Amino acid sequence: MAKPLYKRVLLKLSGEALAGEKGFGLDTDTINDIAHQISEITDMGVQVAIVVGGGNFWRGRTGEGMDRTTADYMGMMATVINALALQDALENIEILTRVQTAIEMRQIAEPYIRRRAVRHLEKNRVVIFAAGTGNPYFSTDTTAALRAAEIEAEVILLAKNVDGVYDSDPNINPNAQKLQELTYLDVLQQGLKVMDSTATSLCMDNKIPIKVFGLKQSQNIKKVILGEKIGTHIYS
């Protein structure tokens, strides 16, 4: 059996990924499929941390007429809903999981403590980071880059609704070309919509590679872990 390339990874899931084809809310079948994909790599001994977005319920920047700080905090609460849903799906298939939130809510999750998170990973528990960084004006992409640096993840697995990074929007331009490899500077200079510039810069500064791939295709998380050439590889 092929060996995984990585020992510890951070998986970034957008809120939209949890909504499935519905585009809003939570799709149980989609969440269960993601949980089974995660179980495939934990069974190989890979330590998995997850950052979830909240765009299937709310995006802070879309709160028209609303105070930006308030809107961002609402988005953080949406990520907690998603984290609990994913935790439930994982634990239903007997994957020990802990949710840690950047804003304390001890009745439902642990507060984020880096040492505790690392200890959970060492015990082969999945750790889900929710509520972003706990601060407004920072995206969940930036949270993923920050947490990956803090827990010393070897790679960020950026699961998207498209199968990689394209030179233009493939939903608009049928001739859009998928890019197999990019540097962080390519992403920043070309304005490619991978992560926001803060998150990309943080990955560049800490030399954390990023694998961008489609989540819709079955077993793609496992394929990336085993080194199959899918999606887009971003590196220094």
UniProtKB/Swiss-Prot annotation:
CC per GO annotation: cytoplasm
GO molecular-function term, one example from the UniProt record: UMP kinase activity
Catalysis performed (reactions): UMP + ATP = UDP + ADP
Chief location category: cytoplasm
Pathway noted in the entry: Pyrimidine metabolism; CTP biosynthesis via de novo pathway; UDP from UMP (UMPK route): step 1/1
Residues that hold UMP according to the record: G54, D72, T133, G134, N135, P136, Y137, F138, S139, T140
EC number from the UniProt entry: 2.7.4.22
CDD domains reported in the protein's UniProt record: AAK_UMPK-PyrH-Ec
Region of interest: Involved in allosteric activation by GTP: 20-25
Localization in the cell: Cytoplasm
Enzyme class: transferase
Activity regulation as described: Allosterically activated by GTP. Inhibited by UTP.
Keywords, ordered alphabetically: Allosteric enzyme, ATP-binding, Cytoplasm, Kinase, Nucleotide-binding, Pyrimidine biosynthesis, Transferase
Protein's UniProt keywords contain Kinase: yes
Binding annotation for ATP: K12, L13, S14, G15, G55, R59, N161, Y166, D169
Pfam families: AA_kinase
Top-level taxon of origin: Bacteria
Gene3D superfamilies attached to this UniProt entry: Acetylglutamate kinase-like
Protein's GO biological process: 'de novo' CTP biosynthetic process; UDP biosynthetic process
Functional description taken from the UniProt entry: Catalyzes the reversible phosphorylation of UMP to UDP.
NCBIfam families recorded: pyrH_bact
PANTHER family: URIDYLATE KINASE, URIDYLATE KINASE PUMPKIN, CHLOROPLASTIC
Family: Belongs to the UMP kinase family.
Assembly: Homohexamer.
Name this polypeptide is given: Uridylate kinase
UniProt source species: Alkaliphilus metalliredigens (strain QYMF)
Primary gene name: pyrH
